[in-house]
Amino acid sequence: MGALVIRGIRNFNLENRAEREISKMKPSVAPRHPSTNSLLREQISLYPEVKGEIARKDEKLLSFLKDVYVDSKDPVSSLQVKAAETCQEPKEFRLPKDHHFDMINIKSIPKGKISIVEALTLLNNHKLFPETWTAEKIMQEYQLEQKDVNSLLKYFVTFEVEIFPPEDKKAIRSK
């Protein structure tokens, strides 16, 4: 709604305003410095043909300019670019492992990626049984790349929750 009002105000009396601007006096050439005037007079007196050359129109150049044909095309709109981007190769997917965490929302996982639950599970398995859950086994089990698995095992760890008893009470030891 606001665009209609702005467009109406912008286009109001447009022709009269344009004609007024066109009919204004054109700006005159800036005055030359006095030292430049003397140099120009000296050069024109030495080379009088230059003054005629400046005022003369070059017919050959004008014919070249008339032969110039400019063919332009609008840039590709963003909608066409987005449409081209959406046409990608279909990715390979796999089903999530171990459905015991009630992962209702996750139907499939792209190959080379894992869910949060799977990441926590494999990190915990590797921490508890490092000789069984090696990087190679994790790579094969979850279809990941070797460098990703190595980085995951190197830089991520699961939390250990330890509850320390208050210092004034004795801890109950389990048998």
From Swiss-Prot:
The modification Phosphoserine is found at S35. It is found in: Mitochondrion; Membrane. One of its GO terms (molecular function) is calmodulin binding. Transmembrane segments: none annotated. It is a lipid-anchor. Changing A3P: In MC1DN15; results in altered complex I assembly. Induction: Expression is low in quiescent cells and is induced in exponentially proliferating cultures. Expression is also induced when prolactin is added to stationary cells. Induced by dietary differentiating agents such as butyrate and retinoic acid. GO terms for cellular component: cytosol; mitochondrial inner membrane; mitochondrial membrane; mitochondrion. A lipid is attached at G2 (N-myristoyl glycine). Keywords: Calmodulin-binding, Disease variant, Host-virus interaction, Lipoprotein, Membrane, Mitochondrion, Myristate, Phosphoprotein, Primary mitochondrial disease. It holds the Pfam family UPF0240. InterPro entries: NDUFAF4. Phosphorylated on serine. Prolactin stimulate serine phosphorylation. One of its GO terms (biological process) is defense response to virus. It is linked to Mitochondrial complex I deficiency, nuclear type 15: A form of mitochondrial complex I deficiency, the most common biochemical signature of mitochondrial disorders, a group of highly heterogeneous conditions characterized by defective oxidative phosphorylation, which collectively affects 1 in 5-10000 live births. Clinical disorders have variable severity, ranging from lethal neonatal disease to adult-onset neurodegenerative disorders. Binds calmodulin. Interacts with NDUFAF3. (Microbial infection) Interacts with the vesicular stomatitis virus matrix protein/M; the interaction inhibits viral propagation. Involved in the assembly of mitochondrial NADH:ubiquinone oxidoreductase complex (complex I). May be involved in cell proliferation and survival of hormone-dependent tumor cells. May be a regulator of breast tumor cell invasion. PANTHER family: NADH DEHYDROGENASE [UBIQUINONE] 1 ALPHA SUBCOMPLEX ASSEMBLY FACTOR 4, UPF0240 PROTEIN. Belongs to the NDUFAF4 family. This is NADH dehydrogenase [ubiquinone] 1 alpha subcomplex assembly factor 4. It comes from Homo sapiens.
